[in-house]
Amino acid sequence: MTFLQRLQGLADNKICAFAWFVVRRFDEERVPQAAASMTFTTLLALVPVLTVMVAVASIFPVFDRWSDSFVSFVNQTIVPQGADMVFDYINAFREQANRLTAIGSVMLVVTSLMLIRTIDNTFNRIWRVNSQRPWMMQFLVYWALLTFGPLSLGVGISFMVGSVQDAALASGAPQWSGALRTAATLTFMTLLLWGLYRFVPNRFVPARQAFVGALATAFCLETARSLFTWYMGNFDGYRSIYGAFAAVPFFLLWLNLLWTLVLGGAVLTSSLSYWRGEAFRRGFDSRGRFDDVLKILLLLDAAQKEGKALPVQEFRRHINMGYDELGELLEKLARHGYIYSGRQGWVLKTGADSIELNELFKLFVYRPLPVERDHVNQAVDAVMTPCLQTLNMTLAEFDAQAKKQQQS
């Protein structure tokens, strides 16, 4: 077997082809650049976020020990072993921030909300979301993350750590407490990432796909943290170069790696919807887009006749495409008044006998220029005009014609 034949065999393999699809999306979404931007934003907003979160927790004395668990969790996750000095500085800055005036406190809250908004925008870009949540809904979500987020984390971490210690003591093998603690941290990190991937994007994300992406990312994060700690413990040549500041560049490198893995997990999660029906092999070109639009409208027309709405996942049972591509088409059809989103799902706004195929073709494939055109534009219009005239039929007429051809 030649080398080219082996490459062709890899391309035909479903797992290899899907892995290459994820790598391409990782590059298309410019994850390394986004991770670098998130690193800088985190560096600026980390102290304000911790200050606001701990300040909210301190309002309720019963949550004091849980807020300490949250801070310890942040220390273990964000600051790798060997860069502990950085977290000492962060704690010192946080204590100084507690002495700020009212205006300074407001700026802390604003800076914290900016970090969460940056995360929200980055996730929505990965899921290719065009329509953002209403600003009031965004504010409520961001504020809930700042207030209830650390409390939930603290409660969960305290519960898990206590359970691990009890299990180790009950088994008579306290030496297993380290492994059990790692398993508990991995479990909790998976749940945290699952919540991010499932609810942060303004797009439907199946719970199972969010869990797979979160589990893979949590394993990568734990492995990276172990390797990072091992390197810093066994190769200390960097200390002779940076001296007392050695922890700072490694802290920045770790933050960058952390965000690269988290955003890479988001790319993986958003790509999992392409696995079914090998949708990752097809190209999302104008022809495919037009065909998918017709399928969407025909499904909605059939649902309308039965008096029901269609949830997003129902479309995926009939059309092989990812949820982000599907969401783009649904949002565009909604913007142009063909469909709308109700509580139960998507609904056709008008009847199939009122939808013209040539208008859909102009919307999704080719639209003649309304302004003054040169000879090339005029020649293209002359070629396309017969095509548009051929499409001068309604969706109902097209459906009847398609069924007739299927029967013959």
UniProtKB/Swiss-Prot annotation:
Gene Ontology CC annotations of this record: plasma membrane
Q: Which UniProt keywords apply?
A: Cell inner membrane, Cell membrane, Membrane, Transmembrane, Transmembrane helix
Q: Which segments cross the bilayer? A: 43-63, 100-120, 139-159, 176-196, 210-230, 248-268
Where does this chain mainly localize?
membrane
| Annotated compartments | Cell inner membrane
| KW Acetylation (keyword) present | no
Q: Does the keyword Protein biosynthesis apply?
A: no
Q: How is the protein disposed in the membrane?
A: Multi-pass membrane protein
Source species, domain of life: Bacteria
For this chain, the family text in UniProt reads: Belongs to the UPF0761 family.
Q: What is this protein called?
A: UPF0761 membrane protein NMC0462
